[in-house]
Amino acid sequence: MKTAARVDRDFALLFVVMLTIAGGNTALQSVLPALGRSLRVPDSAVAAAFSVSALLWVIAAPVWARRSARHGRRAMILLGMGGFCVSLLVCGIFLTAGINGWIGGTTAFVCFILGRLIYGSFGCAAPPAVQALVAGNTTRAERTKALTLLGSAFGLGTILGPTIAPFLVLGTIAGVEIGLAGPAFLFALFGLCVLIAVRQLLPNDLTPDTATHGAANAYPSIGGQSSGASIVAATESDTEQLAEQVAYRDPRIRPWLIAGLVSGHGQAMTGQAIGFLVIDRLNLAPAEALQPTGIVLMIGALAALLVQWGIIPNLDLRPRAMMLVGLAIAAVGCALTGLATSLYTIACAYALASVGFGFTRPAFTAGASLAVGHHAQGSVAGKVTSVNGAAFVLGPSIGVGLYEAQHALPYLVAGAAMMALFGYAWVRLRER
């Protein structure tokens, strides 16, 4: 029988696991534009590094979610944290080799992408197992609150990662310049500490309770705050026997999924290109861009979380109205970001766009959920999570590809797409 103190300790440790996986990824994302420029690799290669990682995450996450019940949740958490640490260590080693000129910049970045493949393949094993442990140790009445609090770790990670990344840049150690590779090494070290704590403190669940399981989480990325869909999927796990399977083409949810996919791509496009925009609009050297980039990303993440945690709960908005409001705000914010020329205007415009996306993400999640009955909630939640993840597979590469053609283009295209989607949503979105 677990004591209350033991339960609280285990929950705090699981919270740190989720926070670390999200924070480490977004910290690396925030420094990659500067790293790419310093290694003289194309901007599109930087985006590709995260696109392939996100693709593997989308593919592998459901597989690990199913296996967590058979192989033990603790084992899956250890696998996920191990993949996280190895990935960052590999990335740090090859980035350091490129920074010091031991290998060419292109070779360093190809090896860096291989490290990102490890993260996408194995890092996604931990979040479903964390959910399953929490779900298995709470009553149904307590579960939603506990999983929601756990899910907030991903949101906090999107703030903390870019915020602390500039302070993790290291100098020369033993004659080797670490520089911009510092965040990779330090997050790998922190992840190792978390892995050891999990191994020592979490109980070994060799005979897991198969009545509850976790659900695949969307790829933790800049701008990719949790939609809550994986929480719904996890809380519906004990009614699987009565579950109704819903197809992507089901007319009840298809308009909502389209709205989520298009708005998600807009968010991914603008978020991935923002580091390059800061460097070029402010005419900064790569190393000088870390702090202003971190400021812009932090303000954007705070704006989105303020909407999701503070504004939406106090407004009586239905999903359709929430989507329309969000699209209008996001369209204006994206266009202004593309035209901004100073740190202040970039930060304010990007924050405005983030406010808009802070409305659209939960709007499409809630709209799809309300479009079906109780027994279809788990199926719909899985599809919502897949759509969220899919946006971060192609979105970053599309955004940076447009940026290479013309710096304002990803923001103007995203703004135009949000306005077109506004028209579609006005006509097609219906609530049950």
Protein language model regions, located:
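Cytoplasmic helix-loop-helix junction between adjacent transmembrane helices
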Residues: 115-154
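C-terminal ends and interior cores of transmembrane alpha-helices
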Residues: 82-105, 329-341
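Short amphipathic helix-loop junctions that connect adjacent transmembrane helices
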Residues: 30-44, 272-291
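Helix-to-loop junctions at the C-terminal end of transmembrane segments
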Residues: 60-73, 306-319, 403
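Juxtamembrane intracellular "pre-TM" segments in multi-pass secondary transporters
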Residues: 1-8, 203-258
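Central cavity-lining transmembrane alpha-helices of secondary-active solute carriers
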Residues: 48-66, 295-310
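Hydrophobic core of transmembrane alpha-helices in multi-pass small-molecule transporters
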Residues: 19, 101-125, 345-359
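Intracellular juxtamembrane helix-capping segments at the cytosolic ends
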Residues: 125-138, 359-373
